[in-house]
């Protein structure tokens, strides 16, 4: 303690005399050397300088001469500034030290004036600078200077500055807080050498080892800083190990094998495999190998990639078996072709390929459903998606044969057939009486020739499990585009039927359900839509319209008498060629006169009847005629006649409770809305493509709503298919109560927008039928009709006239109830 106080007193005395003593010595040394300051020659550490004449040492190259700087005591005792706030107003940045502040001021604010120790680039030509301690008698004087200012400051603060920081354990004092902290780490510890000599600090131990050459102990080899780093790393490693252990205790989510494999599924095209009784054939993917716990809910829809579908533009989404998603069809317009995204309701899909644009037929006729156990049937969903096309031909090459030659540019068909019934076995009855058939199809047919006819059909059926229900929704958009005329045909049909189940059983022949859809199509198209058959309608084999038409199967007459069947079919003929009459010979003819006009006065060129829904269909190897055999074609002069029709038909079938248990009640609700547009080819078309030099335009709007309620079980068969076969221009009803109301509205005869007169007509017909069965053969019939027609239905109408006449006929008929005993 006394030594430290004496050293402090000597230091204070040196501080008092050092300011003038050191410069004097430096000046004297410089004057004696008569040149720049040169540091003394090298000597051993801890040795004292010896006189020059005492020993002769070899000449050693002198270090380069430099500038010797002796800083003042106040400059060395100045505290180091930390966390310095930038002096520029509004900056607010805090710098860790003064050099960082100077760098910030120069680089960020471009300020160099008033900076303490500004950053100046060192001149390479100037010599090095040396810094010596200002305390007189200090060994780190001019003879042993420091190369950096920080080193001389550290020396001064450690050896000569006031020791303000004291240790609480050993009462030692230190000039800086950092020195006290370093001492606290080693305070009270004993550093023992391998020879057994103890030391109070690691530094003293290192000095002993350096002098004696002993081996340093392993626990003291690493410096304290490195030990601290190693301890921190070990602590962090422990924390990480604990975290990993806690995570290992929890279940780790793993990727679902089913989801990963679902994108690579290839659906089998065989109905027999998809209808097998084994459950493994009805699952899309294999079950996971081990149980898995998902953090997120499992998705309900899986995307099925079908790489073999080369021409398809409609992706198919197949939900899982336990999915509650509803079937959805989304249409996407992709230019000329119409795409769709179809969500199939169940988990089994089938893809059928092998289509050709000319002779469109599938690979082979699909086999029948063969199941060993007729009772253990499971729900099966089959999806058929077909798209095939051909490059369009040049329209200029087909000016002479417009009606005889048409090429397919794009055909896109998507079908979904769901069978929730039991089994499909020929010549056998089903085990239960519940059956349901759901079909959803979309067709895009476009013809690149003089007559362009794209057609889009959408069909959807909803069937509950308790009753046999059939619903068909069809929408057809047909457009005709030639170099001389243009027109548009739009048809929308929706049918809903509900039938009460009875004891009768249904037997269906599903042979070749989808195999022969396009089997007999060459340049013409003949696709027949069949019946939606329920178990309360027939009890014998029923013809399915998708079968080849050269092998038709008819119904038994006895069965037809016992249980009526509703047959829906349609023909795309624009106008009917004959009248429709049912078993009761009650007919409503709307366009019979117009038909005669078109068939007699326009024989110039024949319009090719592309029968999409026809009754007669030759074999697959036989070329179809230009028109149906049973219906003569209607001649049109394409250059003089233009026809476009927009037909929207909505049909709903509802079930009425019967008063007796034996008869089966059937109800039919038909609502038809027709927009019929007739114009000369030289007249201007509204909303259609064509020339702008039209001379005459006539419009006819017809809206018909018909409600047909119950057909008794004893009544003869009502061929509704024949009714709808001729474009719904003639309607035959067999109902007890009929009410028809027709309104016709005509616009002014002179319209300044056209060169000639334009006549607009609107006809609306509403028919309601209802009845009640009392004695089994008694009908109460009441008919009321009101009609308004225009003169274009007359036989003497000329299409090329500049003026047209208007005539209105209103008829109202009321029939009293009467009794009918025999049908």
Swiss-Prot record:
Species for this entry: Homo sapiens (Human)
Region (Required for formation of RAD51 foci): 223-442
Protein name in the entry: ATM interactor
Region listing for Disordered, in residue ranges: 28-67, 214-234, 268-289, 610-634
Any one of the GO BP annotations: positive regulation of DNA-templated transcription
Annotated PANTHER family: ATM INTERACTOR
Function: Transcription factor. Plays a crucial role in cell survival and RAD51 foci formation in response to methylating DNA damage. Involved in regulating the activity of ATM in the absence of DNA damage. May play a role in stabilizing ATM. Binds to the DYNLL1 promoter and activates its transcription.
Pfam families assigned: C2H2_ASCIZ (PF24757), C2H2_ASCIZ_4th (PF24761), C2HC_ASCIZ (PF24759)
Biased composition range(s): Basic and acidic residues: 214-225
Start-end of Low complexity biased regions: 49-59
Swiss-Prot/TrEMBL keywords: Activator, DNA damage, Metal-binding, Nucleus, Repeat, Transcription, Transcription regulation, Zinc, Zinc-finger
Biased composition, class Polar residues, residue ranges: 275-286, 613-629
GO CC field: nuclear body; nucleus
Assembly behavior: Interacts via its C-terminus with ATM. Interacts with DYNLL1; this interaction inhibits ATMIN transcriptional activity and hence may play a role in a feedback loop whereby DYNLL1 inhibits transactivation of its own promoter by ATMIN.
GO molecular function, one term: DNA-binding transcription factor activity, RNA polymerase II-specific
Residue ranges covered by zinc fingers (C2H2-type): 84-109, 165-184
Cited Gene3D superfamilies: Classic Zinc Finger
Intracellular or extracellular location(s): Nucleus
Tissue localization of expression: Ubiquitously expressed in normal tissues and cancer cell lines with highest levels in placenta and skeletal muscle.
């Amino acid at each position: 303690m006394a030594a430290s106080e004496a050293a402090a007193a000597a230091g204070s005395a040196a501080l008092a005399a050092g300011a003038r003593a050191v410069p004097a010595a430096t000046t004297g040394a410089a004057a004696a050397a008569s040149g720049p300051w040169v540091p003394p020659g090298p000597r051993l550490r801890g040795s004292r300088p010896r006189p020059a004449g005492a020993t002769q040492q070899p000449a050693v190259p002198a270090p380069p001469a430099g500038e010797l700087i002796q800083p003042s005591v106040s400059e060395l005792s100045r505290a180091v500034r930390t966390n310095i706030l930038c002096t520029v107003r509004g900056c607010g940045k805090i710098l860790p030290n003064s050099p960082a502040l100077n760098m910030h001021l120069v680089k960020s604010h471009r300020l160099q004036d008033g900076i303490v120790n500004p950053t100046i680039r060192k001149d390479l030509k100037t010599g090095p600078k040396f810094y010596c301690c200002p305390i007189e008698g200090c060994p780190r004087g001019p003879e042993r200077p420091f190369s950096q200012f920080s080193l001389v400051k550290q020396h001064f603060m450690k050896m000569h500055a006031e020791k303000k920081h004291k240790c609480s354990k050993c009462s030692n004092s230190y000039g800086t807080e950092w020195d006290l902290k370093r001492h606290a780490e080693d305070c009270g510890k004993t550093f023992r050498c391998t020879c057994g000599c103890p030391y109070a600090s690691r530094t003293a131990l290192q000095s002993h080892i350096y002098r004696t050459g002993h081996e340093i102990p392993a626990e003291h080899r690493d410096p304290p800083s490195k030990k601290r780093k190693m301890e921190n790393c070990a602590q962090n490693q422990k924390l990480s190990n604990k975290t990993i252990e806690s995570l290992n205790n929890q279940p780790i989510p793993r990727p679902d094998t089913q989801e990963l494999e679902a994108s690579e599924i290839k659906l089998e095209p065989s109905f027999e495999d998809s209808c097998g009784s084994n459950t493994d054939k009805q699952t899309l993917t294999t079950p996971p190998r081990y149980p898995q716990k998902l953090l997120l809910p499992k998705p309900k829809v899986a995307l099925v990639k079908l790489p073999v579908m080369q021409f398809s533009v409609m992706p198919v989404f197949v939900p899982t078996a336990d999915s509650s998603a509803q079937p959805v069809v989304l249409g996407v317009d992709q230019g000329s072709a119409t795409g769709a995204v179809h969500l199939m309701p169940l988990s089994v899909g089938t893809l059928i390929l092998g289509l050709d644009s000319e002779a469109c037929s599938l690979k082979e006729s699909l086999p029948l459903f063969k199941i060993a156990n007729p009772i253990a049937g499971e729900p099966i969903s089959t999806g058929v998606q077909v798209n095939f096309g051909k490059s369009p031909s040049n329209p200029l090459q087909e000016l002479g044969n417009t009606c005889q030659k048409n090429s397919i540019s794009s055909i896109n068909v998507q079908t979904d057939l769901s069978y929730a019934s039991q089994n499909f076995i020929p010549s056998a009855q089903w085990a239960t009486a519940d059956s349901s058939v759901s079909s959803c199809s979309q067709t895009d047919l476009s013809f690149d020739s003089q007559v362009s006819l794209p057609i889009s059909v959408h069909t959807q059926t909803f069937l509950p499990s308790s009753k046999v229900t059939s619903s068909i929704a069809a929408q057809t958009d047909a457009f005709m585009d030639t170099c001389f005329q243009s027109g548009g045909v739009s048809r929308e049909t929706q049918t809903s039927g509900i039938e009460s189940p009875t004891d009768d059983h249904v037997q269906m022949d599903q042979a070749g359900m989808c195999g022969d859809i396009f089997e007999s199509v060459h340049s013409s198209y003949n696709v027949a839509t069949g019946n939606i058959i329920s178990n309360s309608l027939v009890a014998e084999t029923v013809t399915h319209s998708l079968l080849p038409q050269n092998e038709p199967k008819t119904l038994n007459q006895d069965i037809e008498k016992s249980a009526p069947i509703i047959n829906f079919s349609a023909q795309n003929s624009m106008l009917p060629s004959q009248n429709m009459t049912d078993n009761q010979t009650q007919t409503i003819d709307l366009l019979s006169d117009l038909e005669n006009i078109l068939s007699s006065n326009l024989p110039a060129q024949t319009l090719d009847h592309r029968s999409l829904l026809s009754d007669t269909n030759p074999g697959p190897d036989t070329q179809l005629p230009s028109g149906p055999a049973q219906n003569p074609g209607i001649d049109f002069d394409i250059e003089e006649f233009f026809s476009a029709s927009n037909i929207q038909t909505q049909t709903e079938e509802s079930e009425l409770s019967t008063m007796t248990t034996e008869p089966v009640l059937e109800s039919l609700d038909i609502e038809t809305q027709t927009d019929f547009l007739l114009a000369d080819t030289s007249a201007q078309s509204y909303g259609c493509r064509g020339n702008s030099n039209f001379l005459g335009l006539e419009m006819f709007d017809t809206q018909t709503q018909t409600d047909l309620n119950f057909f008794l079980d004893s009544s003869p068969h009502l061929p509704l298919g024949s009714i709808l076969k001729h474009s719904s221009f003639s309607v035959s009803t067999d109902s007890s109560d009929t009410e028809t109301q027709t309104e016709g509205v005509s616009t002014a005869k002179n319209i300044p927008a056209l060169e000639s007169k334009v006549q607009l007509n609107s006809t609306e017909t509403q028919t309601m039928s209802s009845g009640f069965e009392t004695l089994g053969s008694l009908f109460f019939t009441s008919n009321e009709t009101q009609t308004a027609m225009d003169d274009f239905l007359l036989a003497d109408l000329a299409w090329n006239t500049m003026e047209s006449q208007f005539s209105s006929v209103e008829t109202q008929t009321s029939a009293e109830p009467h009794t009918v005993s025999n049908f």
